[in-house]
Amino acid sequence: MTAPILKVQGVSKHFGGFTALSEVSIVIAPGERFGLIGPNGSGKTTLINCISGVLENDGGRIVFDGHEISRLAAYQRTRRGIARSFQIPRPFHSMSVLENLLVPLAFVGRGSRAEADEILRQIGLADKAATLSSRLSQVELRKLELARAMAARPRLLISDEAMAGLSGSEVDEVLKILFDLNAKGITIIMIEHIMQAVMRFSQRVICLDAGRIICEGTPEAIVKNGDVQRAYLGA
């Protein structure tokens, strides 16, 4: 049996008297496409912040590739193979697309133009390499955000609302990129409010509500679950 790439074991997070996560446990297999859904305030962002190292969990353990990483800084987790794209892209607007990619490559100890060119080709931004990031469209900014995450050569990529605000055809573009990256062996956690995108992409989905997992299963099972409909869809 293949060992999981990520185990979240009884993770809790508190902000003062508020419990954002309450003993959340998930296990993700290498190469899996994993969806994370839930209403606003359900704990999705807190969970991925704990996984990526932006926040330190108050209870429980986070194990990546067989090693506990609960107390590692975010940059240490990145170097171990966890990367994340953020919901709101914040590129260096005075830099070109290529320069924006060379910065994270240098951070992880590589600055190869050839590697940057290959990432841009994979993401679909090769023809925008010399373009200032301030001139990019919304979907191009989302692609650049994914490219910057790929600079870390991740084994686990967390895609945080990469399709928010995009048109249907643009959502299809981003989904194709994520499918292609997954086909190369990258495990992907997708956090997304666009339910159709999550259901098309994910092999397995969990739904959070009030910091707890209320349902876990296939996309088909999730959309039919009464608890999910009440919590996430307002039914």
Question: Locations of the language-model features?
Answer:
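Glycine-rich phosphate-binding loops of nucleotide-dependent enzymes
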Residues: 2-235
